[in-house]
Amino acid sequence: LDALREQDAEVYAQSQFERAQIIANDANTPFNKKIAKISKLNFKGAGRFCMELFIKNKEPMEGFDRFPPIEQAIDLIYDFPAAVNMQDAEYNALFYALGKSDQKPGSASKIFEINALMAMKDAGFGDARLSFSYTCAKCKSSVGLFSHRCPVCYELGSMEIRAQISEKTGEIGQTF
């Protein structure tokens, strides 16, 4: 990054992301202090980064208060066993659509797939679920796993989560 900085390239977000990784991997820092330090860093995806740490460390999500916009975390929260962040209308709509909350949202979600799941749930059709793919907004590459940095063009914070409606299956997807 120093070489790029000398050429007047914008490296602030990358340096913040690297700091977050260093803080997250510091074994001497208590978990709560890690989250507090990372939350103060300013890079796209900091909220998701903290949420990933909560999940990785098996911390209860009740202690998490910096939820990212649902567009940045829908794939993480989709399989949560219980509803979280219900004061946010988008989170509320998703958990209502999944049947994990009885609190019907007051307005439609801005994500079409969530609205479709809610309509199917209300109509008694419960055989739908969401699957996710990840696309870089800069180079348009599509990958199977989320990454904070595009694995093709290396752009930080450019991965978009795309939800698709698919059919629920009773199988676990393992080969014989």
What are these regions (language model features)?
Residues 58-62:
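Short helix-capping/linker segments at secondary-structure and domain boundaries
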Residues 11-22, 44-57, 82, 92-96:
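Amphipathic alpha-helical repeat scaffolds of TPR domains
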Residues 73-176:
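Cys/His-clustered metal-coordination modules, chiefly Zn-binding fingers
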Residues 1-19, 28-41, 63-81, 87-91, ...:
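Alpha-helical repeat scaffolds
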